[in-house]
Amino acid sequence: MPTNIYVTEEELKKQEKIMKEIAEENKGKNLYYHIETYGCQMNVHDSEKLAGMLEKMGYKYTENLEQADVLLFNTCAVREHAEIRVLGRVSQMKELKARNPNLIIGVSGCMMQEKNVVEAIKEKYSYIDIVFGTHNIYKFPQLLWEALNSQDIVIDIIEDTKNVIEELPVKRDSNLKAWVNIIYGCNNFCTYCIVPYTRGREKSRKPEDIIAEVKELAQKGYKEITLLGQNVNSYGKDLDEDITFAKLLYKLNDIEGIERIRFMTSHPKDISDELIYAMRDLDKVCEHLHLPVQAGSNKILKKMNRKYTKEHYLEIIDKVRSNIPDIAITTDIIVGFPGETEEDFLETLDLVERVRFDAAYTFIYSKRAGTVAANMPDQVDDAVKHERLERLIELQNKISLEKSAELRGKIVEVLIEGISKRDSNKLTSRTRTNKVVHFVGDESLIGKLANVKITETKAWTMQGELVEVIR
């Protein structure tokens, strides 16, 4: 596997040329693609880039796998369960390939950065045509061209790139809300996490490139952006200029047309007063902070290499809430980390009780090959993990329900996102605190900001009545 490479302008022009050649070859043909995405929002945005390139090469999107001429699986390696799901899904494609030998099947993403997975693909999935990772999406046109002109599997994996690749075509899933990468990779090396190995070291985009992208989105009518990074708080540390994440937020807040700014994910050790004050003072930055705590025991946090304590985390929460009283705070929590005792788990429950998160994404610890935690002693029994997860979910569901109930009877600002999937007579909208509200309204309101009165509440979704359209 090649190490870090610098992607030149000439290389990107080569890919552009190949895209044009494939598009010319595909003229007049009804060719289709389908992409299945697993994992985080970074993967979702990567899939949008792959879709953008495929559309530029003359392919149209289809939900029907039988109709597809190119089928891509963009994979996630964070948890073993996700890998099992992906490989199970890929194995189902053998019959489809037998019925349609000209179908190009590609597997990409974080799983492909693992050598053992690539070897398994070569040995057990001979009908796969293309294998590539997270760092060379820009090279997809060439890989597709090679697969179209060869009977051999095309494998292209690199460890990392030294530079950020800009200006790839993007086909976004929404014409209202957009993902915007600001930093790639991670330098934190939490002992349970494979991301630094699959996504590489931190690389920040230049602020002028981010600003240009957001201005273009505003001109196209996008109302909300979500800034993405494994740790957005690290933004700018690797750049030779005076820029921080908070300073970037100030620049983006000034862009006309954008109504809302969100971001994820933040690392507690890097939350600064500057960022808290920016969230408080900037009118477009939404009152929602996703701040993964992972555990409530200092012993476990140290074993995880999280670089903060329970007490430090609680201090951050107090400071955030004292400056932004109505903020919604969500988190990630892992149960069953190696060495976690009942006492350690009770510390986590205590933290959940004290913080009262609006929601928590809860996970059972999953051993990932190549991480420090995979070789730790005192692995927790599966039955104990599941029992602890159930207790944690029960507590958090109760808190989420109580937090949502606090909004009953109140009027809140929402961005109207579309028609409800469950009731075509209703619209789906989202509060600044990232809670979903359904209410009766005309589809002409989609894309508007409105005030809605909350009438019914569940843990994370609500019913409301339209009060007024803001703009």
Swiss-Prot record:
Residues 31-149 form the MTTase N-terminal domain. Its EC number is 2.8.4.3. It catalyses: N(6)-dimethylallyladenosine(37) in tRNA + (sulfur carrier)-SH + AH2 + 2 S-adenosyl-L-methionine = 2-methylsulfanyl-N(6)-dimethylallyladenosine(37) in tRNA + (sulfur carrier)-H + 5'-deoxyadenosine + L-methionine + A + S-adenosyl-L-homocysteine + 2 H(+). One of its GO terms (molecular function) is N6-isopentenyladenosine methylthiotransferase activity. SMART domains: Elp3. [4Fe-4S] cluster 2 binds at C186, C190, C193. Its main location: cytoplasm. It is found in: Cytoplasm. Binds 2 [4Fe-4S] clusters. One cluster is coordinated with 3 cysteines and an exchangeable S-adenosyl-L-methionine. Residues 405-468 form the TRAM domain. Pfam families: Radical_SAM (PF04055), TRAM (PF01938), UPF0004 (PF00919). The keyword tRNA processing applies. Its cofactor is [4Fe-4S] cluster. Gene3D superfamilies: Methylthiotransferase, N-terminal domain, tm_1862 like domain. Keywords: 4Fe-4S, Cytoplasm, Iron, Iron-sulfur, Metal-binding, S-adenosyl-L-methionine, Transferase, tRNA processing. Residues 172-402 form the Radical SAM core domain. Transmembrane segments: none annotated. GO terms for cellular component: cytosol. Monomer. Catalyzes the methylthiolation of N6-(dimethylallyl)adenosine (i(6)A), leading to the formation of 2-methylthio-N6-(dimethylallyl)adenosine (ms(2)i(6)A) at position 37 in tRNAs that read codons beginning with uridine. NCBIfam families: miaB-methiolase (TIGR01574), MiaB/RimO family radical SAM methylthiotransferase (TIGR00089). Belongs to the methylthiotransferase family. MiaB subfamily. This is tRNA-2-methylthio-N(6)-dimethylallyladenosine synthase. It comes from Thermoanaerobacter sp. (strain X514).
